[in-house]
Each structure stands twice: as structure tokens, then as C-alpha cells.
């Protein structure tokens, strides 16, 4: 699960650096769920940015589903009195559903990761 706070409409630099430092050997052909958080109605730009470039050489496989937690201060708090109850229930259900999808992709991609087919020294980096 990749959690990215929206930072001025972008993914924070530290998270971008993570994707540059790790290679196909650590992340390759593993499924990932993108979760972005925003203090307002944003959060979509980091999803697009992650999908566009963060997987190139490390070969991380983003699943089609993602979660954008908007108005994050009003949901998922330990103290339920601080939550917007309907939004909180929605996000909890949505996150649970998305994690189930991620688990399915993890099972489906495991044989691919275990095969030698995905590790080719001549084609070590993305195009």
C-alpha cells in the first residue's frame, strides 16, 4: 500500500526518492494500491503522478483501484466524535474493499514473480 499525502498538488519528494532508490529486485511485479490523502477536496494529482512515472524501473504493478481520502481530518480518526460518520463509514468500507482487491492481485502475481521470465538482465530497466 503506497500512501501519499498531497503536497502542493504533488507526491512528496521523499516518496519519489523511494521509487528511485528501489529496483525491480525489491518491488518488481508486486501489486500496489495507491492511497492519497488531502486536507481538502484534492488528492487526484498524486494518483496520476504515481501511475505515470513511479513504477518505470522498479516494475511495481499498480492495481486499477485506488483510494483518495479527501477532507482527511474528518475521517478515520481514533475518536469517533471527530469523524463525519457517513464519510468515515464510506472510507472504511472502500479501503476494506480495495485491500481485498489488492490481496487478489498479490495471489495472481505471485507465480509471475517466482518465474525467471520477469528477470532479464538485458532488459533491466523500463523503456
What is each stretch, according to the model?
Residues 63-127:
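Glycine-rich phosphate/pyrophosphate-binding loop and the adjoining helix
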Residues 2-58:
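Helix-loop-strand module that forms the ligand-binding subsite of alpha/beta enzymes
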